Amino acid sequence: MELRRLVRGRVDWPRLEAIVRELRERYGREELHVRFLEADNWLSTPMVVDDEWFVKVISKQNSLVHALFTTGRNLGAFSSGTEGFFEHFGTPLEMAEHELEATRRMREIGLNAPEPVEAFEVDGFGVLVLEYLPHFQSLDRLDREREKQLAPAVFEALYTMHEHGLAHGDLRAENVLIVDDDVYFIDATNVSDEGAEDSWSYDLACALAAMEPLIGAKATVDAALESHTPEDLLAAIYFLDFVNIRPDHDFDAAALKGVIGQRAT
């Protein structure tokens, strides 16, 4: 087994079969059609079941990788002049339960998110079951004009999260899904209540970083200012360099800082 496969915690088929059997029994199905997603995902094995449920299988290795990511992100937060606000989960089941609850809370405050079904454990694996959204596109798969049109809605949804005391913690273009011109958030991570305000600024920095390569710095800042204040964006500036060193973000931090500085004066 190659190292990347081992570290990512990919689940062998016999173990997946046990999980599929559990799903079949829980939902009263004689047969289930399972389709695995070709996703570059270090934190779970994702699959679509009967085109009805989106299922994440989370292994102990996935939990270990999450712990490593959490440590790295907290070190990055320290480098931005604030205490770390990311939190780790103790077990694969806790990872699944957190995402289930985060998805439920987003829906409760009126945001679009897949309908949460349940989280449970099978042989030490955490299993998360959500509604499957069959006709979605991730934000970065749209044409530029449509991305510009939807950008204000992305920032408004993020503002709504923060107004209700929630934080996403891992906002990237692939975690923003578009279904019939509606914006859906997925894959929220775990942040501490004590670091709420810093985590909101970090979220906003991530949103700016996700949008800038798609529509440019000026259009990104204009879209953000439809729901956020210049002071909000100035607070986010402190996290842009930290976000910029993440391998899953690639954007022009200097351009964003320049436009934010112009708008804030």
Q: Which stretches of residues belong to each language-model region?
A:
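ATP-binding glycine-rich loop module of kinase domains
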Residues: W42-M95
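Conserved catalytic cores of large enzyme domains
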Residues: R4-V11, S63-S79, D123, R263
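Conserved kinase catalytic-core helix
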Residues: A96-A113, F136-E174, V179
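Short beta-strand micro-motifs within the conserved protein kinase catalytic domain, predominantly
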Residues: E115-F125
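Juxta-kinase regulatory segment immediately upstream of eukaryotic protein kinase catalytic domains
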Residues: M1-W42, D241-A264
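C-lobe/activation-segment region of protein kinase-like
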Residues: A188-A264
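A glycine-centered beta->alpha junction motif in the catalytic cores
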Residues: K60, L75-F85, V129-R144, A188-V191
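Catalytic activation segment of kinase domains across protein kinase-like and atypical kinase folds
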Residues: V122, E131-Y132, Q137, A167-A209, ...
